[in-house]
């Protein structure tokens, strides 16, 4: 499991590590937790299970060979919102999903080398996975990422980010 000590949302700290600790009481399958220092708040670190990201990375080589994957290997599972029924885990595989988001991101946005792209969505949604993370990375797109809500601390936040980072391509899904 990879998490952070916390994250900022609307001026408050979301206790991500504490949430992970609580969820791990429900499973026996997670062996290690890697924690990124983001908010610098005090968190419980379980010896032998929890490791600071920064301490792990400083010991690693700058070189990392990519892992060879089969086309139908699992890429990720994303759960539906559960607004109409119990949330369902949707399995996304390597080749089909990556081909789809690479193609749609390229075709819809017609990204050029000098473009600055921003998708204002939540990474917890399929839109965020697809058009904040995978599509832009696969297309080598210069992207803006931000932490928090697009309307906090006020309704000008979204447009101030567009202006500050000179965004000229965007997908706003809020």
Where are these regions (language model features)?
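Structural core segment of the AMP-binding/adenylate-forming
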Residues: 1-55, 165-166, 171
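Short beta-alpha connecting loops at secondary-structure transitions
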Residues: 4-6, 88, 118, 143-146
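A generic structural signal for short coil/turn motifs at secondary-structure boundaries
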Residues: 9-12, 43-44, 66, 88-89, ...
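Conserved pre-ATP/AMP-binding loop-to-beta segment of ANL
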Residues: 33-35, 46-79, 86, 94-96, ...
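Conserved small/polar residues in nucleotide/adenosyl-binding loops
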Residues: 80, 172-174
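Conserved AMP-binding/adenylation subdomain of ANL enzymes
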Residues: 98-116, 126-169
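Residue(s) in the substrate-gating loop at a strand-loop-helix junction
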Residues: 122
């Amino acid at each position: 499991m990879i998490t952070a000590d916390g994250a900022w949302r609307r001026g408050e700290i979301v206790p991500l590590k504490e949430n992970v600790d609580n969820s791990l009481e429900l499973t026996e399958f997670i062996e290690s937790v890697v924690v990124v220092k983001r908010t610098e708040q005090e968190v419980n670190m379980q010896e032998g299970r929890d490791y600071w990201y920064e301490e792990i990375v400083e010991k690693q080589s700058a070189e990392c060979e990519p892992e060879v994957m089969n086309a139908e290997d699992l890429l990720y599972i994303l759960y539906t919102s559960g607004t109409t029924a119990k949330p369902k885990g949707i399995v996304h595989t390597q080749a089909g999903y990556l081909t789809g988001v690479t193609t749609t991101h390229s075709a819809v946005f017609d990204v050029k080398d000098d473009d600055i792209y921003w998708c204002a969505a939540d990474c917890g949604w399929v839109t965020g996975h697809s058009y904040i993370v995978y599509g832009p990375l696969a297309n080598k797109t210069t992207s803006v990422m931000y932490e928090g809500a697009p309307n906090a601390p006020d309704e000008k936040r979204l447009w101030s980010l567009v202006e500050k980072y000179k965004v000229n391509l965007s997908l706003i899904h809020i």
